[in-house]
Each structure stands twice: as C-alpha cells, then as structure tokens.
Design a protein with these regions (language model features):
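Short, well-ordered loop/turn elements at secondary-structure boundaries
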Residues: 126-127, 154-155, 248-250
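Surface-exposed patches in mature extracellular/periplasmic domains of secreted proteins
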Residues: 109-119, 161-166, 184-192
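Hydrophobic h-region of N-terminal signal peptides that target proteins for export
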Residues: 17-25
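Bacterial N-terminal signal peptides that target proteins for export
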Residues: 2-16
Length: 297
C-alpha cells in the first residue's frame, strides 16, 4: 500500500497552496483546434499515449475503457478539438496525462505517464486494479463486455465513471450495470464515507463544468440542451450525484461522478488560471482520494 506525501485534515490547505503555486509548472500543452467539418463526418481514432519507454508494471497505470455508443453526430460522437471524437475519449489524452504527472509530482504514488486504452474484453484488463470510463450516456455494452466487466470487478478491480449529465444518461449507465450485475446496488456517497477523507477531507464531490461552457455563462454545470434528451431541464443537471456501487459482499466496486466533469479539471488545468484555482485543485483532491481508496481496499 502506498502513502501520500501530504497528510490529512488541516494539511489540505498546504497542499492547495502548493497546487496554486505550481499552476503553470506543467507538461507541454497541445494546440486545440476549432470545430470539425459538418459535411464530412470522420470520427477520430484516439490512441494510447502511455510512455512505453519508461513503463513499469510496478507503477500505477491509468486505464481508460474504450466502448461503443449508439447514435450519430452529437450522440455517439461529438465535436471537440477540431475533430469528431467518440464519447469514450472525452478529456483524452490530456486528462490522464496531467493527472499522472501530478501524482508523480505531488504524491508518493508512482504512476506511468499517460493512459492505456483497453476494451473491457481485452485480457490485459485483468492486470490493472483501476479503470476509468468517461461520458457513458450513449454507451452500449455487448454481452461479452458485460461478462468481462463483472469478472473484472468481482476479481477486485475498481471502476470510476465520470462526466455524464441528466437523468437519461444516468439511467443508461444504471441499465448497463444492471445487465452486468443485477443484484449490485447504487447508493449516494456522503461526506462521512471513508473515501471523502482517506487523504484530503472533502465535504462534497465538486461540480466541474467543461471549460468552454463555463467561459460562456459562468455556471458550474453544463447546459442541459447539450446532453441526452429528455434530461428534465436545468434542475436535472445542477446537482452533483456522487454514487457508489456495492457488490453482494458490500465491497465498493465502482464510483460514479454524475452531473460533473472531474476529468476536465485535470485536462484544462493549464488553459485558464481562474478555472485552475476554482476547479482543478478540487478535481485533483477528489482523484487522489478515489485512487487511494481503490488501491487500498
């Protein structure tokens, strides 16, 4: 079991100050392009950005799940960074690249730089204790993927699902997980759960919007019209839901950060100083709590 350099409780403030002072001491940034062409739909095929030259099996590896989604433009894939991107690739690659860089910089967690992209049916998945799934509002899982995910979680693996908004997108995840394990139950993670204070004391899961949408209106939630319909309107997306999934033994096998985009806090940390100070610091604190819990329980 690894330890974190910074201590608990009051020492969170020291860490926050360190984060602010290091706001622009970052890995290289990549250029972000404009909107993709609407008359020629070509979906990008993102690749793993793991630094294989320095990869070590003894280090933490951020594994992002590759999956299929239903629908067309704006559904199965969306415009971003000048191209059409599949839902599973939301916040990739900079999200995990920055998170693993910060883990190495600020904690004693030794992490491989970048992320590894795997499908649920890839045999390699069983070699890693943690997997991350983004933007699953339109996700579809095959029977083989359902079986593989249940096997992974039953064998001690841990899943984090992030960045999906509104009741319709929650229901899609809930329905998929019901196919994975019908008897497993979701519950609300409250401030007294150990995951909220295992390293840094947090009173709640922060709500983090996509940076480009935050710049438009200053709200902490994404506007409901950009997500899966019907979504119930603004009240449906303005409240964060931080939920956990228990297996039949009562073990926490998955967490879901719903109505928030935690990974955007990592991805966009160097794009806007106000966004960094208001959102990125909290995004890293929650991530370290979740990863510490996942790796030690």
């Amino acid at each position: 079991m690894f330890k974190i350099v910074c201590g608990k409780s009051a020492r969170l403030g020291v860490w926050l100050l360190a984060m602010v002072s290091l706001a622009f001491a970052q890995p290289p940034r990549r250029f972000r392009g404009g909107s993709p062409r609407m008359d020629s739909i070509q979906v990008a095929d993102p690749k793993s950005d793991l630094d294989l030259a320095s990869f070590s099996p003894d280090r933490f590896t951020f594994v992002r799940v590759v999956y299929d989604s239903q629908g067309g433009p704006g559904e199965a894939y969306y415009p971003g960074d000048g191209e059409w991107r599949p839902r599973w690739a939301t916040d990739h690659p900079d999200g995990a690249k920055n998170l693993t860089w910060r883990l190495n910089q600020l904690t004693t967690i030794r992490a491989n730089q970048g992320s590894l992209l795997l499908r649920l049916t890839d045999p390699q998945l069983q070699d890693f204790p943690f997997i991350f799934m983004s933007d699953p509002g339109w996700q579809v899982l095959s029977e083989a993927e359902q079986k593989a995910l249940r096997q992974y979680l039953s064998n001690g693996g841990f899943l984090w699902v992030d960045d999906f908004w509104g009741e319709a997108e929650w229901k899609n995840l809930e329905d998929n997980m019901r196919q994975v394990a019908p008897s497993w139950t979701w519950f609300n993670i409250t401030a007294d759960h150990p995951i909220m204070s295992i390293v840094y004391p947090l009173s709640e899961c922060p709500q983090i919007p996509a940076l480009q949408l935050y710049r438009r209106g200053g709200e902490t939630y994404d506007p409901p019209w950009i997500h899966k319909q019907p979504n119930g309107g603004i009240p449906d997306v303005s409240k964060v839901n931080f939920r956990g999934l228990h297996d039949e033994r009562g073990r926490l096998v998955a967490v879901a950060t719903h109505n928030t985009d935690i990974a955007d806090g990592w991805e966009r940390e160097g794009d806007d100083e106000e966004f960094f100070q208001r959102f990125s610091v909290k995004a890293y604190a929650l991530a370290i709590n979740i990863l510490t819990y996942a790796m030690s329980n």
